[in-house]
Amino acid sequence: MVKVYYNTVQPDLYNQSLHLFSIIGFLLLSLVWWRSRRSILIAWGSLVAWFLVLWLISEHTFEGLVDWARRSVAIGSAYAEVQSLSLGQPILLVMYVVFAIATVILLVRRHRACSSTRTVRIVSSLLVLFMLYAGLKTGFVREGNAHAFEAFALLIPALIWLAAPIRVTVRRLALLALPAVVGISILVGERPAVGSFSSLYNWPEKASVWIDDANLLTSTVVFERKADAARGAAQAFYGLNDDMVRWLRESPAQVDPFDASLIWAYGLPWRPMPIFQTYMNFTPFLDGVTTTALADRHVDDTILIDTSWVGNLDYRLSLWTSPRYQLALTCSWTPIHRDGRWEQWAKNPSGDRCGSPQSIGTENVSANQIVTIPASGPDSFIVATFTRSSAVPTVLAGAINLLYKPLDPFTIRLGEQEMREPPTFDGSRLIVSCPSGLPVTRRYEAVCPSPLTISFSESGTVTFERIPTRSS
């Protein structure tokens, strides 16, 4: 069901529904073809084949797969460093661990009973272990009930696959138990109160929601009515005035940092960045892709910025979410219209307003040492570059970070605000102070009170640079 959810408009329970249909489809295959292992192999083979076809259609080469995999790992590691949350419902993790232990036991039993070649057994074992690992990282890195449901969705096929060599009775019991497991996962997964199973007692309401969803999928009238209601609710939430809507209809826009559903709500022309949710740029590579796209945008393109996110955005400072992109936006773009929390930016007619960075000091700092940021003055920005010491983490900490989530993520404290920053951005220029003569804009509110102090949760070297600017 389409609805307003927090600060965006999205299909309700989209992830859960997607995985539910995937599991149901797999169950049907398994019931028709009792040798579940074959259906799993068919599913994985189809997935790999389609991936390769799409990869080649997109004019990529096989050699590029290695680079793609390397960058994917870097992005995933940075995501875990920045976005990891404390576990809201430990029982979900306990359930997952129990399932994982059962999976490993089944894997061992299967190898003892199976007459397959060693290569087949090794490949199948690696595949099962990968599914366990992917489920753990997906479900419990950035812990949320929907994410935890994804973990079970990844684990359940492994259990079915491994149940294949066991007696038919046990296999049938495993298959019959799956709908109950899926149902519990869905009930637990729909945003219950933290630390409780309160949603388990709301099944009549959930049944009503599922009936509404079925009507939405099968009735054009219901779909249009729900879509109109969602569009109206979204417009009420975003609150753009008529003038801003008119200006945006004249110029294709990118919405920063993430609210692309605004484009749908108002029917606006959209020209997104390659990573259209710019706060998701977790590595210098993604930052560079977005920065290049910003420089290549048409002269009539605009950027619509939601300045209500100047502070904490998923534990990060909005101005630091993509350092090169944010600095390029600061130097080459300018605000042209304002409407409450929204600012429309366009390319600066006179080009880049920033001069070359000038170093004004370097200091070796210990963990959590407070440093005063130099004053910016009326016509210059101050940027800070921090490089962490090459301290080698303990084996235990490294293993935990790889398998689960960082126990002590890297943080930067700016004044009274504590923010996270991906380790991949070591050496990136972060805006820490803005010119006192800056045009009126809320985008820099977090760094404009001067002088601020800054500290880092690890030891390293901090360098401050002054970037001179002109008013136009």
Feature-to-residue mapping (PLM):
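Transmembrane catalytic cores of multi-pass membrane glycosyltransferases
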Residues: 1-129, 138-149, 187-212, 423-425
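Hydrophobic/aromatic-rich transmembrane helices and adjacent perimembrane loops
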Residues: 141-171, 175
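Short linear, low-complexity motifs centered on an aromatic residue
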Residues: 87, 164-172, 345-355
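An aromatic- and histidine-rich active-site surface loop
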Residues: 148-152, 256-265
